[in-house]
């Protein structure tokens, strides 16, 4: 069994990055929800 988390900065940014979130309607909903929660970090 290998470790399931294989870190990659490129994959992290592409899947959970700000621009990816902004590109879809649901992604913008996620960002707004995190803003109202008062999160310091909105996304990767």
Swiss-Prot record:
Keywords: Ribonucleoprotein, Ribosomal protein. Coiled coil: none annotated. It comes from the Bacteria. One of its GO terms (biological process) is translation. The keyword Ribosomal protein applies. The keyword NAD does not apply. InterPro entries: Ribosomal_bL34. NCBIfam families: rpmH_bact. Belongs to the bacterial ribosomal protein bL34 family. This is Large ribosomal subunit protein bL34. It comes from Ehrlichia ruminantium (strain Gardel). The gene is rpmH.
